[in-house]
Amino acid sequence: MTTGDCCHLPGSLCDCTGSATFLKSLEESDLGRPQYVTQVTAKDGQLLSTVIKALGTQSDGPICRICHEGGNGERLLSPCDCTGTLGTVHKTCLEKWLSSSNTSYCELCHTEFAVERRPRPVTEWLKDPGPRNEKRTLFCDMVCFLFITPLAAISGWLCLRGAQDHLQFNSRLEAVGLIALTIALFTIYVLWTLVSFRYHCQLYSEWRRTNQKVLLLIPDSKTAPTTHHSLLSSKLLKSASDETTV
């Protein structure tokens, strides 16, 4: 497979070695062998995967358009109408791509895939809710809730006990003040709890919508015959070498 200019097609393989990051990666890897860098980007330009491989490791047969690996470890599929080097893909690679891009169709030929989406458990969101600021906010709110809840309960109970004692000594003004303080305290606590809970519920709903486990439902007829493609590729290479010799 030869590399060309950067195409930036959504869901396609983008060969781009111009940035400093790629040059650094190439220098740190196997310096003695020619290499190429491929990228998979989303619609908004977000980098979803980067593959740096030596040219000598390429397979003569069909390869996955996402990871550039052959069909030795996992069989290749042709689930859409794309042809050529973009027509074959690993099932697991395509599932990760659909999950990351939050789509259910091919970005190139717009073929709709039959997929089953399963939401991830809430425990995964608690472990990794997303960006760093969201992690910090969730942690701080949980700590504040654990401290403020017993503090508000004890403060309210003490205020009510004080109001009861003042009523016994006919100090109605102090009793009314303590009751009003208790009501204000619990009102602020309930409002803060509801606002924080609603905010984190919205974050969780968005995370659950964009971080689903995608299962690709592919019929057997869509399986790419890897052996057949390998034999066909070998025949083409052999015929090309014969023509070159002649």
Swiss-Prot record:
UniProt gene name: marchf2
Chain positions recorded as Zn(2+) 1 binding sites: C64, C67, H90, C93
Zn-finger region bounds: RING-CH-type: 56-116
GO cellular component labels: cytoplasmic vesicle; endoplasmic reticulum; endoplasmic reticulum membrane; endosome membrane; lysosomal membrane
Known pathway: Protein modification; protein ubiquitination
Enzyme class: transferase
CDD domains: RING_CH-C4HC3_MARCH2
Domain of life from the UniProt record: Eukaryota
Membrane spanning residue stretches: 138-158, 175-195
Example GO biological process: protein ubiquitination
SMART domains: RINGv
Localization of this protein: Endoplasmic reticulum membrane; Lysosome membrane; Endosome membrane
Membrane topology, record value: Multi-pass membrane protein
Native organism: Xenopus tropicalis (Western clawed frog)
Entry-linked Pfam families: RINGv
Protein name: E3 ubiquitin-protein ligase MARCHF2
